[in-house]
């Protein structure tokens, strides 16, 4: 797989996989689950998956956590189905979940939706990468 995708692409994908695994694992904690961190790691999975796609296609991208922006940049070589654009919802979790502030806590339902969206992005990126081989 390294030969097919390249080392950098695999590094981005591995980091994305670690983020989603951590998000899923947090849901199994017997103590109070930090849903904001579940949502944060889901956002990170989606972001890193999209960046892996851009690295694979040798497309420069800005330093950003904005999923909408990354989807737009990725749309040059790939056409995404409409459900992928729902992942724009994840952008808010990139910063607001990491620092104290006025924002409301993330609910279990919101955390589960964040995981589902991140998994959709990760799976779709993997399918697109496989098509490119």
Show which residues each predicted segment covers.
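Terminal alpha-helical segments
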Residues: 1-133
């Amino acid at each position: 797989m390294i030969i097919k995708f390249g080392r950098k692409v695999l590094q981005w994908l591995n980091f994305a996989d670690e983020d989603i695994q951590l998000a899923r694992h947090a849901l199994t904690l017997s103590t109070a689950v930090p849903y904001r961190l579940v949502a944060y790691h889901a956002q990170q999975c989606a972001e890193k998956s999209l960046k892996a796609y851009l690295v694979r296609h040798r497309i420069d991208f800005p330093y950003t956590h904005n999923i909408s922006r990354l989807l737009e940049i990725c749309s040059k070589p790939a056409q995404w189905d409409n459900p992928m654009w729902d992942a724009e919802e994840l952008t808010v979790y990139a910063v607001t979940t990491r620092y104290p502030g006025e924002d409301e806590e993330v609910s279990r339902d919101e955390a589960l939706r964040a995981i589902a969206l991140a998994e959709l992005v990760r799976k779709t990126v993997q399918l697109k990468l496989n098509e490119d081989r």
